[in-house]
Every structure is written in C-alpha cells, then in structure tokens.
Amino acid sequence: MGGYILAIDQGTTSTRAIVFDGNQKIAGVGQKEFKQHFPKSGWVEHDPEEIWQTVVSTVKEAIEKSGITANDIAAIGITNQRETVVVWDRETGKPIHNAIVWQDRRTAAFCDKLKKKGLEKTFVKKTGLLLDPYFSGTKLNWLLSNVKGAQVRAAKGELCFGTIDTFLIWRLTGGECFCTDATNASRTLLYNIAENAWDDELTEVLRVPKEMLPEVKDCAADFGVTDPSLFGAAIPILGVAGDQQAATIGQACFKPGMLKSTYGTGCFALLNTGKDMVRSKNRLLTTIAYRLDGETTYALEGSIFVAGAAVQWLRDGLKVIKAAPDTGSLAESADPSQEVYLVPAFTGLGAPHWDPDARGAIFGMTRNTGPAEFARAALEAVCYQTRDLLEAMHKDWRRNGNDTVLRVDGGMVASDWTMQRLSDLLDAPVDRPVILETTALGVAWLAGSRAGVWPNQEAFAKSWARDRRFEPHMDEATRKVKLKGWRSAVKRTLIAA
C-alpha cells in the first residue's frame, strides 16, 4: 500500500475525486456534473443514484489518471455538500425519494410554524442553528410526512437517514458502516453540539425516530473499508467532514480567530472559536469546526446561498457570458460611473438576514446598462455579502480586533479582479493559497494523518503556502458610497419580500 490519499468531494453541482501523493500534491483528478431537479418553485432535488454513479466513475478516473492502482491508496477521505437529505431502505439500500438539497425552501412554512410555537430558541441553544429550511431536520420531516408509509417504516427501523456522506459511506462499504461525522451531524437541527449527541427533544419535535439516525464519529476515524468489487481493493475510509469544515482544515485555520471563506455555489465563511461555543447575537451560526480525538473545536459561520450560482445565472440565464472565467474580464470593462447592484436572493437571503421569502432584484439600471455592468454587479454582490458576514463575525468575536486576514478558496478565487474587489470592499487583506482545492486537501489530511502517511496538524499547518495577498486599494470615500448603495438595495429587497 502506497502513501496516496483519495479525496471524494461530493458537491452541489458535480462530484470530484482527487488523488494526492505522499507530498500532498495532486496526482490525478476526476470530475463529473449531475442533473439538478426543480420540481416546483423553490424546490431543489438530486437523484442519489446519479450521485452514486458519479462517485464511482470519478474515483476510477482519478486513479487511472494518477497512474496507480487502488492498492496504492492508503486511505479515503469524504467531503460533501452539507444539509442535503437522503432516506433509503436499510435492506436494499435504495432511496425512497430524491435527495432534498440544502438550497431547497419547501419547508419555510413549517419553520414559521415552529417559530410561532416559540421553539427557535430551543433549536438555537442546542444546535447553534436557526430554524431555517436550509438545514436537514425539516427536510427529513417533510420526507417522512409526504412519502407514503415512511413515518411508520422509519419507526420500525426499516429506513436510514443520512446526509450525503452517510449515504456514500453506506454504499462504499456495502452497507457495513452506517455512520457520519460530527460536522455533518451538527448541520441537521437534530444534534446537540454541546453534548455531542442526537437530541431526544429535537427528534421528538421533528418526529424523527432515532432508529434511523447514524452513529456519529470524529472527523478522523474508522468509517469502514470499501467493497473490493468497486475499485479492486478494500480501502479504509478514515476521514469525513462537511465541505466547509473540510475547507477550514485545508486552509489550516486551526487557531482561534483564524478565518476562511469558500466561494463555490454559495459562499461560506467560518471563524475558528476554539473550545468556546460563541453564541452569535448577529444571526450567525454556532457550529462544529471539527472533532479530533474526542475534542470538539467550534466555529462561527455565515452562509450565503448565492455566490458562484450568480455567475451560472449570467451564463445560463442571461447568457451574457459563455464561460464562468470570462466574468472577471467582462466586469473589469464595466462603466465606473454606473452603480448597479444585484441582490442575488434567488432562493432567499442567508446570513445575517435569514429571509427565505426574499427574492432577487437589480437596482441602478439605466438605458446604458449592459452585460459588463451585470457581470460586475454579480461579482460585487459576493464581495458585499462577504463584508456583511465579516462585520457580524467581528461583533461576535472581539478578542483580536478587526485585523484578521481572510483566507479564501473555491472556484471564484482564481479571478484576480474578484479578489482585488473583495479586498477593496472589505478594507482588509485577502490571502489566496497555492492549492485552491482546499476542501479536498482538508479531508485528505484527515484521512492521511489517521493512516499515518501524512504529517501531524502542526506540520500540516506550516506547509500551508500563499499564492498571493490582495491588499485594499480603494479609497475610503468610494468604498462608503458603494456600501451605502448596497445596504439600500438589500433593504429594499427585504421590504419587497
């Protein structure tokens, strides 16, 4: 067995498999997109079987491109889109319904009903999360209530619930391991993050039988071995973390006060708060950053639902660009005298507003507004929303002032224009790492360190390397005008909702 580590990165729009060598360098990559299903307005689903097929095919592709065999892989790490819900038959392994995706808003009315009963404080206290359709618990309640016979079958122990990681572990191990990790469990509205256990009161409120819940393990732990018939070897699965927590690890944000922001379909900023569960007074989430050797490290998180998705909208909806990388150069050519604001509330607004009913809007258009101004507005919207998150975080986390350097990753950060504008609007330095695949790298480190073939935490943190630091160049007067315009646009969007 070699020192190679395989990272499975199961995302919202595609699945990636990445093989890292013993020096933490990428040896081979496989990637495959899958279909998004929109049965009704505000509903988003995935076919779990299609996701499973993309995992198998991308793993095989990555191994082949690496020029190795499955026997050379020391361990597998799995990272995944969080909150997305799958329920399957314990005997056959077949899903009873499409997966309900984290973006799905169908349970908004149910969340409001629970809030009116005064239950949000209970959920916040125990889970660190708000009562929002974003999280798994109300989606699971919907499945049990709307799929014929599901509630009764779940109570009999005939059904399994899991986030995507759990479903993949089950499939990869041939049903031998029914488990998840603490980071994914912490996103379900069912897990008590102080006690590190499924919560009896919350499962009762959401009518979720505990018989269908997986075992919760540390992020670096034994999650079984792959069925040899899949890839030609029984490979141990030794690391699991939700995508944003995996990125936090991949960015080596191990010390309290360190901060990262990932720009994929959405944008997610996490601030390491160490052993302290910092309770936000600014509508941020208190969540588990990682759990290693039985010790939990917590984080503050801000979630934005639309980041890269706004660029996809430019490409697929407005058709003003042919490919996502074109956005930065198009934005750069925009007329500086035009201040156009896009509030991309396509599926509601996330932190710190948490308004599922808000809808997207564009402000400031004139007869001369064109594709370049739309492109700039889409990219700037991501920057403005990041600033909103970081301002809320600094109010909750006052220990080190506001001099934090933001570490960034994800597909959007390859754009120099976007990162410079982010630094300008934050009025803070932004660090882009050499390795942009930080989500996969983070979970690869979990698996590799557990397998004993990758360095310990301290050495791994020292190996983090910066590609470029972006420093703010925008003058204060310009920044104030732009921020005032953004806040006005958001306010009008919320009023319209």
Curated annotation (Swiss-Prot):
Source domain of life: Bacteria
Catalysed transformations (reactions): glycerol + ATP = sn-glycerol 3-phosphate + ADP + H(+)
Cellular component terms (Gene Ontology): cytosol
Residues the entry annotates as binding ADP: T12, R16, T265, G308, G411
Documented activity regulation: Inhibited by fructose 1,6-bisphosphate (FBP).
UniProt-listed InterPro entries: ATPase_NBD (IPR043129), Carb_kinase_FGGY (IPR000577), Carb_kinase_FGGY_CS (IPR018483), FGGY_C (IPR018485), FGGY_N (IPR018484), Glycerol_kin (IPR005999)
Swiss-Prot/TrEMBL GO biological process terms: glycerol catabolic process; glycerol metabolic process; glycerol-3-phosphate metabolic process
Annotated binding of sn-glycerol 3-phosphate, by residue: T12, R82, E83, Y134, D243
CDD domains the UniProt entry points to: FGGY_EcGK_like (cd07786)
Enzyme class: transferase
Binding site residues for glycerol: R82, E83, Y134, D243, Q244
Alphabetized UniProt keyword annotations: ATP-binding, Glycerol metabolism, Kinase, Nucleotide-binding, Plasmid, Transferase
Pfam families to which the protein is assigned, alphabetical: FGGY_C, FGGY_N
Coiled-coil region(s): none
Biological pathway: Polyol metabolism; glycerol degradation via glycerol kinase pathway; sn-glycerol 3-phosphate from glycerol: step 1/1
Record EC number: 2.7.1.30
UniProt GO MF annotations: ATP binding; glycerol kinase activity
Binding site for ATP: T12, T13, S14, T265, G308, Q312, G411
Function in brief: Key enzyme in the regulation of glycerol uptake and metabolism. Catalyzes the phosphorylation of glycerol to yield sn-glycerol 3-phosphate.
Membership in a protein family: Belongs to the FGGY kinase family.
Protein name: Glycerol kinase
Species for this entry: Rhizobium meliloti (strain 1021)
